[in-house]
């Protein structure tokens, strides 16, 4: 559990915080008016997980902090919203995440530890990432170029690994890049990923993904391959460097239209202090024709690592990027 005073994580059996000695709540007791979804989740998971609190959520699912009762390690439970669990299409989309992610074993991909389904409640279990998301960091403002390059290089290597196994993520965005306790970047949420041989993935004719990070071909509902994820990584990199994505609009259609038809302003034109060579890498990722982008995630990772090296950086940024790249040897499956 997390200390309500200082935020330090403690085992569920602890009575006081290991850091500040504050009294910790007894998580074995349910709150007087528990959230209905938490109540259902506790019923479904039984004694296996100690569900502690809601961390947040999106349009598809709610995310809860829990502790594995036997291993005493913090985990995250992602629970499909109840009304969506009744929709066969969304139900299959949620199940797809567990199936897709279970095939992926890479140090820069958040693994699925477990999954369950009972009484209309569907959930997946993942390790808790205490470092937050890239979105959290960007929320504080534009990030240092070397850090952005390292984070995207790690994500690119992880996605290359997935692509070589026939899986395209399709929803790469800052929210889906998380950090572990050591600051390593991990890609998560393969919720709309699908093996290439299954063909296009649309819902009732709609393009799937997040408009601000969606490739042109995805916005048009076309078949996509790994280069769609490269485009999305370009937008993630752009946002990390300047603090906002290249395209915005009053609605999803307007943003999607710009993804297809408009050329983004170079990051250098937004902030002249951004290195031109790094901006060129970003703009290549954002090429409208997929053939003009980096062909593979490893190609992008290599370009970013070379750029980091050119700055003279030899610290954690270079180490983390290079470690991720070595975990994804070219040609390996």
Short names for language-model regions:
Residues 157-167:
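Protein kinase catalytic-loop region centered on the HRD/HxD motif
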Residues 81-103:
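AlphaC helix of the eukaryotic protein kinase fold
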Residues 115:
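Activation-segment/catalytic-loop signature of the eukaryotic protein kinase fold
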Residues 25-38, 291, 295-333:
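Juxtacatalytic C-terminal regulatory tail of Ser/Thr protein kinases
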Residues 67, 159, 178, 210-316:
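C-terminal lobe helix-coil module of Hanks-type protein kinase domains
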Residues 119-133, 137:
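Conserved short submotifs of the Hanks-type protein kinase catalytic core
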Residues 151-152:
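Activation segment signature within eukaryotic-like protein kinase domains
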Residues 52-58, 63:
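Protein kinase glycine-rich loop
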């Amino acid at each position: 559990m997390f200390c309500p005073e200082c935020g330090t994580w403690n085992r569920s059996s602890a009575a006081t915080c290991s850091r500040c000695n504050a009294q910790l709540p007894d998580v074995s007791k349910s709150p007087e008016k528990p959230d209905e979804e938490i109540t259902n989740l506790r019923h479904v998971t039984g004694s296996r997980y100690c569900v502690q609190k809601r961390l947040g959520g999106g349009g598809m699912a709610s995310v809860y902090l829990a502790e594995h009762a036997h291993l005493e390690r913090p985990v995250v439970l992602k629970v499909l919203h109840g009304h969506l669990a009744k929709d066969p299409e969304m139900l299959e989309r949620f199940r797809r995440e567990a199936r897709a992610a279970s095939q992926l074993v890479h140090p820069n991909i958040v693994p699925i530890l477990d999954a369950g389904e009972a009484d209309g409640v569907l959930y997946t279990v993942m390790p808790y990432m205490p470092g937050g998301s890239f979105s959290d960091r960007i929320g504080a403002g534009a990030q240092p170029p070397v850090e952005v390059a390292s984070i995207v290089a790690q994500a690119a290597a992880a996605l290359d690994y997935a692509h070589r196994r026939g899986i395209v993520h399709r929803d790469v965005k800052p929210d889906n890049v998380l950090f572990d306790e050591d600051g390593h970047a991990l890609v998560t949420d393969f919720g709309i990923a699908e093996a290439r041989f299954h063909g296009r993935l649309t819902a009732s004719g709609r393009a799937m993904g997040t408009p601000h990070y969606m490739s042109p071909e995805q916005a048009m509902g076309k078949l996509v391959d790994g280069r769609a994820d490269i485009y999305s990584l370009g937008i993630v990199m752009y946002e990390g460097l300047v603090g906002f994505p290249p395209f915005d609009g009053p609605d999803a259609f307007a943003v999607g239209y710009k993804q297809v038809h408009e050329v983004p302003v170079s990051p250098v034109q937004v902030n002249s202090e951004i290195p031109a060579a790094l901006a060129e890498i970003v703009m290549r990722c954002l090429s409208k024709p997929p053939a003009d982008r980096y062909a593979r995630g490893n190609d992008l990772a290599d370009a970013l690592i070379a750029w980091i090296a050119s700055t003279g950086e030899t610290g954690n940024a270079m180490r983390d990027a290079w470690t991720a790249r070595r975990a994804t040897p070219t040609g390996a499956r």
